[in-house]
Amino acid sequence: MRTLIEARYPSHGIYGEELGSVRVDAEFVWVLDPIDGTKSFITGKPLFGTLIGLCHHGVPTIGVIDQCVLKERWVGVRGVRTRLNGEEVRAAGKPALAEAMLYATTPHMFAEGFENDHFTALRGHVKRALYGCDCYAYALVASGFGADLVVEADLGLYDYAALVPVLLGAGGSMTDWNGEPLTIPRHTASKGRVCAAANAQLHAEAIEVLRDADGGDSKRKRED
């Protein structure tokens, strides 16, 4: 992917999990994650994906989630309806947080203290919490397949930039835990904390539980 981008768009920046980053202050920046969900990949669980995002002036504008085993590809473009294999999709979601299905890759991705406490509190508000879907959980939310909410922490920009246009284009909401936009300039301030929801009401209810009122942070307890 990097070779193709460099050849076709030499002025564009590239922000990648692999091989580092170049020109990240460019007008257009590609954000790449060749394999999101490495553990799923190496164990043959088809919940990993290739993530390709394009940011314009730091804002995620185009996103692709590609699951090669299941032959599923979600394409999101800001201002345009998200498509799965060419067909429009729309997030649905339960009307209340108490009925929602919550996803996260692992409960061990939340740092001890603020993150773990607030995620645990949110888990107490929902119907059920499930784990282990990696980027595929966001695709399920965008497609209206019964996943309502994804809340994660300790993410890199390459983990979520491609997901934002996919969620927004499906009618969902996706921000950091304070309800602020996920952009390149705000990546550090967002602390890798992400909240994606199938609709605005669910998102607002989740943010009320997650919101970082004091800017607190703590030691991470990450399971790589």
Where are these regions (language model features)?
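Residue-level signal for inorganic ion chemistry
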Residues: 1, 5, 38, 67, ...
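N-terminal subdomain of lithium-sensitive/metallo-dependent phosphomonoesterases centered on the IMPase/IPPase/PAP
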Residues: 1-35, 201-202, 207-224
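Short, Asp-centered acidic motifs that coordinate Mg2+ and/or phosphate
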Residues: 13, 62, 147-149
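Short loop/edge segments at beta-strand edges and connector loops
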Residues: 16-18, 86, 133
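DPxDG-like acidic metal-binding loop motif
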Residues: 24-83, 98-100
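An extended, acidic
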Residues: 90-224
